[in-house]
C-alpha cells in the first residue's frame, strides 16, 4: 500500500545518497493479522512490538510537546497582539528512530516514528479519591493516538481519534523539522527549497 510506497521512496533516496528523514506514527498495533473465520475475513490486532524491536532507537530527549483542546485568549501588549493557549492537554511525541540503509552505499537515512505518551502518567489526586478511571483519562487519551492504524471512523469517536492522529503527526513533525533547522542554520530565514524540501505521501490516517 501507500506505506510500502513511502518506504520505497526513503530507501531509493538513501541509495542515491540524498539526505532525507521520513516521519510517521509508531503504531503499537500498526499491522493487523488476517484470519478467515466461517468464510469471512477477520482482522485481529498484531502486537508486533511485544517481542521488542532492536532497530528502533527511542530518543526521549528529543520529544516534542503537542497541545490538545483548551482555549485561546488574546491580548495587546505594547502594540503587539499576544495569543495565549490555556487549559490544554499535553501529549508528548517521543521519537523512535530507525536507520534506513540503501543499496551499495555507506549512506544512511532516518525513519522517525512518533510514539504518543502522556507527560503525566496518572492524576494522583483523583486516584486518591477513588476515581480510578478518570485518573487515567489523560494517559488513555495519549496512548490511543499511537495504538492502532486506521481506527473505524463511522462514528464520532473514530473521526475524533483520526483527527487527533493527524494533528499529532503534523505538529510533532513540523516542530522537529523547525528545531533541527534552527540548530543547523540559527534562523528560519534560510528555509527554502535550497535547504529543505517536504514530500507528503497521502495516507488515510
Predicted regions located by residue number:
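Generic recognition of stable, solvent-exposed alpha-helical segments in well-folded globular domains
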Residues: 4-8, 108, 161-176
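Glycine-rich phosphate/pyrophosphate-binding loops
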Residues: 10-11, 15-33
Amino acid at each position: 500500500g501507500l506505506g510500502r510506497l513511502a518506504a520505497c521512496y526513503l530507501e531509493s533516496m538513501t541509495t542515491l545518497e540524498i539526505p532525507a528523514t521520513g516521519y510517521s506514527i509508531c503504531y503499537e498495533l500498526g499491522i493487523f493479522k488476517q484470519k478467515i473465520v466461517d468464510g469471512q475475513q477477520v482482522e485481529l490486532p498484531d502486537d508486533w512490538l511485544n517481542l521488542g524491536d532492536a532497530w528502533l532507537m527511542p530518543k526521549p530527549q528529543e520529544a516534542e510537546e503537542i497541545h490538545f483542546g483548551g482555549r485561546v485568549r488574546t491580548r495587546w501588549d505594547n502594540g503587539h497582539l499576544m495569543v495565549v493557549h490555556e487549559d490544554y492537554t499535553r501529549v508528548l511525541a517521543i521519537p523512535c528512530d530507525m536507520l534506513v540503509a540503501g543499496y551499495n552505499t555507506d549512506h544512511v537515512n532516518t525513519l522517525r516514528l512518533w510514539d504518543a505518551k502522556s507527560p503525566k502518567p496518572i492524576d494522583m489526586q483523583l486516584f486518591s479519591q477513588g476515581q480510578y478511571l478518570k485518573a487515567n483519562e489523560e494517559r488513555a487519551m495519549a496512548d490511543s493516538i499511537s495504538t492502532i492504524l486506521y481506527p473505524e471512523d463511522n462514528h464520532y469517536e473514530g473521526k475524533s481519534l483520526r483527527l487527533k492522529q493527524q494533528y499529532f503527526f503534523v505538529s510533532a513533525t513540523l516542530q522537529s523539522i523547525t528545531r533541527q533547522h534552527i540548530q543547523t542554520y540559527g534562523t528560519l530565514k534560510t528555509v527554502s527549497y535550497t535547504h529543505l524540501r517536504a514530500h507528503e505521501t497521502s495516507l488515510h490516517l
